[in-house]
Amino acid sequence: MLGDDKDSDDLNLFLNAIGEAGDEEGPTSFNDIDFLTFDDEDLHNPFQDCETSPINEPPKVYVAPRVMISHQDSFSEDSRTDVIEDARILPASPRLRVPASPRAFVYPRSVESPRFGSPRSVESPCFGSPIGVIDTASPFESVREAVSKFGGITDWKAHKIQTIERRKMVDEELEKIQEAMPEYKREAELAEEAKYDALEELENTKGLIEELKLELEKAEKEEQQAKQDSELAQMRVEEMEKGVANEASVAVKTQLEVAKARQVSATSELRSVREEIEMVSNEYKDMLREKELAAERADIAVLEAKEIERTMDGLSIELIATKELLESVHTAHLEAEEKRFSVAMARDQDVYNWEKELKMVENDIERLNQEVRAADDVKAKLETASALQHDLKTELAAFTDISSGNLLLEKNDIHAAVESARRELEEVKANIEKAASEVKKLKIIAGSLQSELGRERQDLEETKQKESTGLARTNDKDAGEELVETAKKLEQATKEAEDAKALATASRDELRMAKELSEQAKRGMSTIESRLVEAKKEMEAARASEKLALAAIKALQETESSQRFEEINNSPRSIIISVEEYYELSKQALESEEEANTRLSEIVSQIEVAKEEESRILEKLEEVNREMSVRKAELKEANGKAEKARDGKLGMEQELRKWRSENGKRRTDEGREPEKSPTRSSTEGRNKENGFGQSKSFAFGEQGSSSNNTGGSTTTNNNNLTPETKKKKKKLSLFPKVFMFLSRKKSHSHK
């Protein structure tokens, strides 16, 4: 409706704006009356009362065409515009005069319209109620063009639909953004991972750069030494050419000074290496002391835990007594519910127990598989050790030229390491074989346990049938004793489990300490090896410099001797050296050679001492590795004991629950024995004869192999038994489980 009103207002404004200049009436504006047609000319028009123009000369009045406007109430494909048909001029209708709007009385318009510039006369005899006359020279052809001059056509319904569509578009974009959020998060995570990888690569490159820097420094030192040696050799050659003697030669002196400086640097480095070795040994001793203190503290903690366990035993016994009293009170209330669900619960519990045992066996098999994998890892390590051995052999072959005496010791060390690795491999193989045998034994034990459980179930059902006749009181005492015994065994199992846990924690701590010690020793070994390599390189450089010096001396001697002979033969001014001077010079040369040899022997002895220290450190490392292997074995044993103790505890708890349910049933049977009718007893006898009271074994979802006839025979045989034999059977039905549990635990401890 609002759109229709607006269109009509715009049309009125247009019709008001296109008047002619010859009109003497004042300007008018349409309010809400669009077109008024009076077919009867005699009808009185109240709007023409104030008109003063003569009747004979009617004014020029524009005949307004009839406009057909069709608004689409239902929305089309393009709902933004209304379909307005072009104005078609229909047959002529009587002329009409339209009064001016009320606004014209208050705000009269100017002579010229501000919008279109059409002149209008304001002179009218009755200014109080002016009449507007519309007159145009050419009529407009289409309403759409006219309306477009005033801002176009609008549809508020279409506008609302546009806003709704925009909102929908915004919601869809939001949903798309929310869907794309996890992808962007993944991309961000991938970028972070790439960042971390880049940082790791940077760290690795930094380490490589540092290593290369160290190698560069070493190469620069060697290059400087080589340059010094070459310069000294050149100087000596120049002196020899000039004819300078050995005593007055500067090159020989500088060579001796350089050799002394190098010897001093080598000795200082050897001292620093010794000091570091002493520091490492002192730290190792301190760590051993701390280890002993930790072991003492662990022993003290174990003693305290045992004392606490003893106190807990007394409290647990008191708790068991109180629980028995409470259960005796609650049995009367829970009789009906236990009778309803006893059979189903027994079956489900048996199935659950067997599944649990199977899971335990599977866990043992998985553990053994893990041990086999660990053995494979040890094999791989042994292969790497063999490769390292091969590398060491190659290094030894290269080092034979330098030190032949130390070859035998290093070979013996390598052979000892190889033998120890072979022994470890044999031990691992033996452990694997033991684990396989343990798996086989566990499977056999599982089968025997299944058969024994079936037998025990049959015995339990037979005892239930017998106890319903009147032997519940005597069996209650025996069951109470058995309950106390089982409670004690449960406490023992809990103690053993806690002891195993404590041992496992202590062994883990010791393992961690041993690993730290081994890492520290490895670091010290690496530093010592690097320094030994540097010392060897310096020794080689010193030997090369000595060789160069000896070669230079020999060349000088040869040149001097040749020059002397030539001078003696050719020139009369030749210098002849006496035999004493010659002997003195030869003695000096021999002394210098002996000094160089003594220095070399000292350096070699220092290297041997460093090698001995290295062998000692290697022995310590081997001892630490052995201790670690022992600790690992102890850890495995402790974990196995803890698992077995947990399993035994669960089995004993299940037996206790069974016994409690049986005890409650017995008491209810005792209370209801006098109330039994002969018909009920007869029906029970029939059920027994038909085999309804037959025992069933629900292990692995299979029924017992006994048929109806055998069930009847067993019931007849059981009725003939005495109360003493019944007590013994009850005890035998419960004790084999305890015996099997203890035997399993002992076998595991022997392993």
UniProtKB/Swiss-Prot annotation:
InterPro entries: Web
Biased composition (Low complexity): 704-723
Keywords: Coiled coil, Phosphoprotein
Taxonomic lineage: Eukaryota, Viridiplantae, Streptophyta, Embryophyta, Tracheophyta
PANTHER family: HEAVY CHAIN, PUTATIVE, EXPRESSED-RELATED-RELATED (PTHR32054), PROTEIN WEAK CHLOROPLAST MOVEMENT UNDER BLUE LIGHT-LIKE 3 (PTHR32054:SF30)
Modified residues (Phosphoserine): S113
Pfam families: WEMBL
Domain of life: Eukaryota
Coiled coil: 165-558, 588-647
Species per Swiss-Prot/TrEMBL record: Arabidopsis thaliana (Mouse-ear cress)
Cleaved signal peptide residues: none
Protein name (Swiss-Prot/TrEMBL): Protein WEAK CHLOROPLAST MOVEMENT UNDER BLUE LIGHT-like 3
